[in-house]
Amino acid sequence: LWVRINNAWIGAANGACWDVQGVAALHARGWYLVSSNHQSWVDILVLQRIFHGRIPFLKFFLKQELIWVPVIGLAWWALDFPFMKRGKGQGAQQNDLRTTREACEKFKLIPTTVINFVEGTRFTAAKHAAQQSPYRHLLKPKIGGLGTALAAMGEQFEALLDVQVMDGQAYRV
């Protein structure tokens, strides 16, 4: 129901060009790891729309502060999305690593799609310049979450789906 409501909303509000390829062999009874860039909050709705019914329900790791976003914070909590503290220091990193491992143990129980935004944050021109990223349209990747998911569930994943959200106008899978 949650995804259907989001799909209806994005379908009514968005006249984007969708370039979706390589999804014919996917199925809703498997486990998938999705790697995607991250331009805006709309990316999540886009991913839900293009994968709905093709792969299992999408799960992603959220900053703890997002639990306080009206309505959707409660929805994410009720849907058992993992919330990360993302603090500085060894203790905070260990807590996030433990949260990631615990979430992956739950994900093993029923078909799930784990999404990892490898840039770790939304793309902006200022962040791109500050990082001196060698990529034209991407920030430097952070592979910690991806590596942890692979270490915990690697053999269970049927495929790694590489998604590129482009220009906020066209979406390509």
For each of these PLM feature ranges, what is it?
Residues 9-172:
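Soluble catalytic domains of membrane acyltransferases
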Residues 1-8:
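N-terminal alpha-helical membrane-insertion module
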